[in-house]
Amino acid sequence: MIVRRYLVTLIALVTVSFPLSAWTQQTGRLPKVGILSPGKKTDMGCGPIRNQNEGPGPGCFVEGLRALGYDDGRNVVFEYRFAEGAIERLPALAAELVSLRPDVIYTFTTGGAVAAGAATSAIPIVVGPAGEITLERLARNFARPVANVTGVTLSSVEQDQKCLQLLKELAPRTSRVAVLVNPGNPNFRSYPDVLRPAASQLGITLTGISARNETDLPQAFAMIRASGADAMFMVDDAALAGTSGTRRQILKWAMDARLPVASSSSRVAADGGLVSLGTDNAALARRAATYVHRILGGAKVAELPVERPTTYKLSVNRKTAAALGLTIPQPVLARADEVIQ
């Protein structure tokens, strides 16, 4: 096992050394990677659940580059900019990074992708992950990006439609679903309209409910009550589903109101939602590192198609189902990757 680990490490170092040696010889400097994060400086771990912004974080991306043989200060330079949770700072921070003339910029979440894309049309940008609608607008063509942006998507419309279908399977009497969306997130603000055709086939009426952050929740809850909703759907938005305190507050209120919650965030079922159909965001961030590796090796953005997740984690919460008087169908239990007792 030790010999195998040594060989894997050696291969990674050799693989990365050739392009970087050529780079240094040609330019007289180390390649520079700009990293734009909506989170905090202290938020550099790569665990499945972290304290503040529980997206994949730059730590998972850096972990991916280390696995490819990159070492900050030795054969690459990382320039970080952190918004410290204030996503309105992202445009200014993206402009700062551009002024440093990095060879490639990495970012994640919809806010980071939009800010970086607006700051430069020349420097290659790798996003991973971010919402599908946002990446489609920035890259313009998934198969062969025609702009300077590529990367991996966070979720897809089809994934959320399937999650809505799972909600109906688990709670068959569901007829009115409140879709909690952040109007400040361009990837999700139109989601009630995007999901409406699929909802109609299931006999479900959707109502969009807006909330930008925890401060907006009391008003959002009042609107959900007024809508007559008998279930709730949470998109995988960093400010709502992606922040532990806000997510748990939403789920506690939903349980008190006896509303089953479905979400495309893999963390929701674990915290008391009924069902989640989510992605492994840490793996997607590590995948984004391979894009940066290829760009530093000479690849053009147009040669790097945008990738969509190919696997999803289905989680169902049996405790929540019991509290709501629901029985999880055996076929759903058989398909589930995780059953929370």
Predicted segments, located by residue:
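Short hydrophobic alpha-helices and adjacent helix-cap/hinge residues
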Residues: 1-341
